[in-house]
Amino acid sequence: MKIYISGKISGTNLTETRKCFAAVAKAMKRIGVEPVNPLENGLTEHDTWEAHIAKDIADLLQCKAIYMLQGWQESKGARIEHYIATEIGMPIMYEIEQPIISENE
């Protein structure tokens, strides 16, 4: 099952954000889930925000669920992804309620 990882990216320290998203993706793989990481969508930081959100939405629509990282509400893109998931009836999981990474990782 594919699950889309959604969270704040714009305006963050990209090195730290990449580590966070990668850790979540690794944990998902460990439990048999296929993660879809928007930081690995083939676009670069030089592409426009509009190009990123268009690709992210296309990728989201190929998934069975969305996993919202803490702080997602602070991200325009993550709020759009959440809205779409809500409107199409996609299951939504929240890191705050269903952490996928243990404190030891």
Regions found by a protein language model. Give the residues of each.
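Conserved catalytic or regulatory cores that recognize and/or transform ribose-phosphate-containing ligands
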Residues: M1-E105
